[in-house]
């Protein structure tokens, strides 16, 4: 809704501007400084500026709008458009009149007959079948349906704790009120979802409360055990298993080994064979290809780098001349009478017959 706002001068005005035709956005107030002239004029962030001192802002750039605001010396007239904000409030019609929704946190009193089961929630006395001493018959209880009608309430003068279970089973949905010396016990048992609480446990608790109030020792009922007829197969099976001594369980493999050990060599059962533990073979007993090579000079095993010459193995440090101990790696070597020599000492040991010259022959590459 467009409206005119006048800010008295001089600057500063106390608001921040954004947008313009160069940003393809309208001129919008984005920030108001608290306590400024803009705040006193009730400007709000989000107000769209339609005109500045009578000049429309449809074709103004951001810089033009700032210049127009700076040019205002005595007062600044702005035409703004503020979107209406409507607060949603639910409407509740009652007797043809609309009024706002009423929220009341206080609990309202409800009628006694509000509940669906239509039972009288006020406690009623009960009657015990076969016992008429000290018990009064309520006028509003129907023994067949267990329902009660609103009528005068009468309380019991005397009560026996052992008769509570019988009375509660006859009318499980009727609350019980018991007047005891100095104590008033009200027991209201309602239906529980999915039989969450046991009726016997509830009655045991109630009987204990009444016995404690009367000064008697509560007699707890013994737990009922399921009796098994002695003639049944289940009873005989349980009785036999209880008397027979149990033997330790063994796996199938140990049982077979035990039978083989107990039986002699002649009376061995058919279809069985002797079982021996596997013997771990020594790794060195493998084929010749897996043997550790032995050095031809020092006689010890070679681990790692090895030098082979005429099917003989040597350590790299043992591959030397037999006379001068010169390492023959990357050099020529000669075998003379089973020994390894360099070229110089090999010539000295190989003297040709008279009339012959010594010629060194190298293997072809």
UniProtKB/Swiss-Prot annotation:
Annotated signal peptide: none
Annotated Polar residues bias: 147-156
LIM zinc-binding domain span: 293-352
Name of the protein in question: PDZ and LIM domain protein 3
Region listing for Disordered, in residue ranges: 126-156
Pfam families: DUF4749, LIM, PDZ
Alphabetically ordered keywords of this record: Cytoplasm, LIM domain, Metal-binding, Phosphoprotein, Zinc
Physiological role: May play a role in the organization of actin filament arrays within muscle cells.
Assembly description: Interacts with ACTN2. Forms a heterodimer with PDLIM4 (via LIM domain).
Alphabetized GO MF terms: actin binding; metal ion binding; muscle alpha-actinin binding; structural constituent of muscle
Taxonomic superkingdom: Eukaryota
InterPro entries xrefs: PDLI1-4/Zasp-like_mid, PDZ, PDZ-LIM_domain, PDZ_sf, Zasp-like_motif, Znf_LIM
One example of a Gene Ontology biological process annotation: actin cytoskeleton organization
Subcellular location: Cytoplasm, Myofibril, Sarcomere, Z line
Chain positions found as Phosphoserine: 18
GO cellular component: adherens junction; cytosol; filamentous actin; stress fiber; Z disc
Residue span(s) of domain PDZ: 1-84
Gene name per UniProt: PDLIM3
